[in-house]
Amino acid sequence: MAEEERALLGPDGGDGGSAAPPRALPAVCDPSRLPHRLLVLALMCFLGFGSCFCYDNPAALQTQVQGDMKVNTARFMALYAWLGTVIFSIFVCVGQVIFALGALVNAFWLMEVGRFIFGIGGESLAVAQNTYAVSWFKGKELNLVFGLQLSMARIGSTVNMNIMGWIYSRVQDLLGHTGHATLGLTLLIGGITCLFSLACALILAYLDKRAEKLLCKEQGKTGEVIKLTDVKNFSLSLWLIFVICVCYYAAVFPFIGLGKVFFIEKFQFSSQEASAINSVVYIISAPMSPVFGILVDKVGKNIIWVLCAVITTLASHIMLAFTFWNPWIAMCLLGVAYSLLACALWPMVAFVVPEHQLGTAYGFMQSIQNLGLAVIAIAAGMILDTRGYLFLEVFFSACVSLSLVAVVMLYFVNHLTGGDLNWSAKKREKLQKVAANDLLYC
């Protein structure tokens, strides 16, 4: 490490009088250069792969879980109610193993405990992932980075949706019967992806510490520390972003969790067809998220993009609720809208809070989102058991409508307060250059 530090410091940075010039680090090993940052970005993306793969295990195996464990829809959706970087990745692995063991020993309560532990790690892992992103990438790069992270996460979800049913069938053929043992072994096989993400977390933690030392980055050098009392200083714009996040995702994740049976019952799809259309949101978001990230980077106007995404999502839910049109249309629209919203919404947090509060802000946003999802997931299961899918779709449409109201309010609040959330990319870049020059000559 000492040699690496001398390589970055240059001829004047070492002990005076060294005759031989220091050897420069290769680009891929130099944290100040693009190839190394791209390596870090790849690790960030894979950090959430295993978590997202295992997060949607219940959705991919809904009929098998309900049949093998003999639970109704409301009880099944409790698996989605406790959604909560090395420690967080370990939580994910332990939670997935306990979840699988619960099925092996035919104890649904143990499966719920496993999902609770998985949530502690999985959602804290998402906060760590977001904090890493804003630490390594700034300004116009941020939308693309969030898009790439979402893309890899959705690839994990898509692979899960399309392969877990097949794995269950192969395990069933191997054991010669269905039941809780078949389900448990299938879930253990799926948990292998968590070990892969844990390895990425370990490497990323090392690279981040190494970069801190090589680039002389000091934590908290301004004297400001991350603390929960930061919450009271959050602006109205940030709170509206929280509301948009909660209400929007409440109409996406619980819907996908219940979507397979919805398409079987309303549109008479086969189990395989239902799994395919239920995963199309994630299939679309995988390639489209980086594209939208670049688009938002180039254009700016984040609020307008969020508004378009919310309106499109509302239209797709209304189509699914009140028409018998080909559901592929609505689901493709939902996939496009979901990709666009994530690329435009999450980076806005970095525009409205100081850098030292980013960890607190993203953590609070994730916590509120998961509290909302916990309540909505249980409510959705109860509505489905008692009222059916039409009422459930109306409920999801109402959630998106609340998100739409919050977006409109955010637009006017941002306009009246002179905020920068809806600036064009050119204007933001110009003002950032002016601010940088002012700091240079201070």
UniProtKB/Swiss-Prot annotation:
The keyword Transmembrane helix applies. The chain crosses the membrane at residues 38-58, 85-105, 107-127, 187-207, 238-258, 276-296, 303-323, 333-353, 364-384, 390-410. GO terms for molecular function: dipeptide uniporter activity; protein homodimerization activity. The keyword Membrane applies. It is a multi-pass membrane protein. Keywords: Lysosome, Membrane, Transmembrane, Transmembrane helix, Transport. Pfam families: MFS_1. Its main location: membrane. It catalyses: L-alpha-aminoacyl-L-arginine(out) = L-alpha-aminoacyl-L-arginine(in); L-arginyl-L-alpha-amino acid(out) = L-arginyl-L-alpha-amino acid(in); L-arginyl-glycine(out) = L-arginyl-glycine(in); L-alpha-aminoacyl-L-lysine(out) = L-alpha-aminoacyl-L-lysine(in). It is found in: Lysosome membrane. InterPro entries: MFS, MFS_trans_sf, MFSD1. One of its GO terms (biological process) is protein stabilization. A motif (Dileucine internalization motif) lies at residues 8-9. One of its GO terms (cellular component) is lysosome. The dileucine internalization motif is required for lysosomal localization. Belongs to the major facilitator superfamily. Homodimer. Interacts with lysosomal protein GLMP (via lumenal domain); the interaction starts while both proteins are still in the endoplasmic reticulum and is required for stabilization of MFSD1 in lysosomes but has no direct effect on its targeting to lysosomes or transporter activity. Lysosomal dipeptide uniporter that selectively exports lysine, arginine or histidine-containing dipeptides with a net positive charge from the lysosome lumen into the cytosol. Could play a role in a specific type of protein O-glycosylation indirectly regulating macrophages migration and tissue invasion. Also essential for liver homeostasis. This is Lysosomal dipeptide transporter MFSD1. It comes from Gallus gallus (Chicken). The gene is MFSD1.
